[in-house]
Each structure stands twice: as structure tokens, then as C-alpha cells.
């Protein structure tokens, strides 16, 4: 399963990316996460359906300092292009 997500709210400067990386890796989900110039966080998640859904559910709360307002999910065809979950810097 593959999901492309956009997380809105207070999600930058609150360890969102590092926390998502930790959660995704613990669940065996591959892909990436990055900050966007408009203040949102963008991520691509690939893995088993249940694991991807758990990362999305986590993103709806985020780490303790985050204030998530919205998570938009776009479902995409699985590509299997990632071997790890990493933080992209632009």
C-alpha cells in the first residue's frame, strides 16, 4: 500500500519529522517525510496496509508538541521504491 499525505497545523519545529521516522521504521513502513514552505508536512508511506494505516493514525495526533489540524491522504499505486524511511530536506 502507498499513501501520500499532507499534515496541516502546528507541525514544524515540533519534532514531527523525526518522530514520524521513528514510528514508520518501527512498523516497517518505508518512504520519506519533509517540511513544506507553507508550514505543512508532506510524507510518502509504503508498506503493509495495517502498518501504513497506523502511521496515518499517528500523524493525526503527531508528537506531543504538535497541534495537528488536518491530514489529507492521497492513495497511490504501490511502487516499492524505498528501502528505508528518511527525512527529505527540500
From Swiss-Prot:
Task: Identify the EC number(s).
Answer: 3.6.1.7
Can you tell which superkingdom this protein's organism belongs to?
Answer: Archaea
Q: What does the record list as coiled-coil region(s)?
A: none
Q: Which residues form the Acylphosphatase-like domain?
A: 2-89
Q: List the catalysed reactions.
A: an acyl phosphate + H2O = a carboxylate + phosphate + H(+)
UniProt GO molecular function: acylphosphatase activity
What family does this chain come from, according to its entry? Belongs to the acylphosphatase family.
Q: What is this protein called?
A: Acylphosphatase
Keyword Hydrolase assigned to the entry: answer is: yes
> Active site annotated at which positions?
17, 35
Q: Which UniProt keywords apply?
A: Hydrolase
